[in-house]
Curated annotation (Swiss-Prot):
Stored Pfam families: Ribosomal_L32p
Gene source species: Enterococcus faecalis (strain ATCC 700802 / V583)
Molecular function (Gene Ontology), one example: structural constituent of ribosome
Protein name: Large ribosomal subunit protein bL32B
Keywords: Ribonucleoprotein, Ribosomal protein
Similarity-based family: Belongs to the bacterial ribosomal protein bL32 family.
BP terms from Gene Ontology: translation
GO CC term, one of those recorded: large ribosomal subunit
Gene (UniProt): rpmF2
PANTHER family on file: 50S RIBOSOMAL PROTEIN L32, LARGE RIBOSOMAL SUBUNIT PROTEIN BL32
Amino acid sequence: MAVPARKTSKAKKRLRRTHQTVVKPEISFDEANGDYRRSHHVSLKGYYNGKKVIKGASK
């Protein structure tokens, strides 16, 4: 079985783990239709930047 030659320091462990964070999605209020949506994404009703971009979106 493989055994590490040296103890991994706290700094090395933490540097390696910096990429394992959970990212909170950016949510903004869309005043055009009164819904919340993710930034730079189409709303659930099919609007983006105040214009209808998806024809068959729900409601």
